[in-house]
Amino acid sequence: DFAVDMSLSKDGIKGMLDEYETDHHTGMNISGMAEHLYDYTSGYPYLVSRLCKMIDEKGTWTKEGLLTAVRVLLTENNMLFESLIGKLTDYPELEQMLKELLFFGKPITYNPTNQVIGLAVMFGFVKNADGKVIPANRIFDTLLYNHFLSLDELGSLEMYKASLLDKNLFVRDGHLDMRRILEKFVMHFHDLYGNKKEEFLEEEGRRYFLLYLRPIINGTGNYYIEARTRSLGRTDIIVDYLGEQFVIETKIWRGNEYNLRGKSQLAEYLADYGLHTGYMLSFNFNQRKQIGIREIVVNGKRLIEAVV
């Protein structure tokens, strides 16, 4: 009795692209494309194959071509995605665990004897990374976010309706105005949920921001949750929109010292991405908090922080 990992490595994907390039002479950056494909699929064979086929059909072997393929793939009604989502109906405990992992950032220790964790691994939703349960890949991760958020949309939640009314306010000359998005979100969140208890905010804040953001970028932009920073205290949302990239850190306020440390970490993270500007969305339960937008510079990086 043994398990066989069928996923492709970065080198394995690169080898496939090397052969393709030899035959088709596209001029692609093979190493870069292999890395991007792996980042989104973690080497899941079907996802690698499907994305490559979609890119091949368009002849756009670039990062933008890949992002377009990812966006289209996530709107497909294929047998793999149908099967995955069907498992959520069949196993309510599995659905609840995945919600806690995705929206609440709940750390889950990998335990092969836990039946729910075992199901999540077997169906391909998650994997074991250094003893922690993490999403198996960005594609499945975003598929789940989209599924859960779409259920909220069908429920006609007020934040979703606010986003639909606002969605045409945020694109200027082809550029996404992320600061303006945060300003409007803070206003709506305070009006709709300002009197809710702390437990509600802590569990629901990030979910409501994604619910507000998704209709704004839908059809044009991509988003994913950065696996390296997913935790109870912090979640980084990465948005790609018409060639521009945005990093939005959502976090729970834990005091000034924690907040300053978080800003330094975000500045370092922006350096990794080659970005000058980053965004923070802080859910603060202090009754004397100052709601709104402020701008600071940390380690040469411009940080725009929204506080609700």
Task: Report residues per predicted region.
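Acidic-basic catalytic patches of nuclease active cores, encompassing PD-(D/E)XK
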Residues: I181-Y224
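Conserved catalytic cores of phosphodiester-cleaving nucleases, focusing on short active-site segments
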Residues: F209, I237-R254, Y269
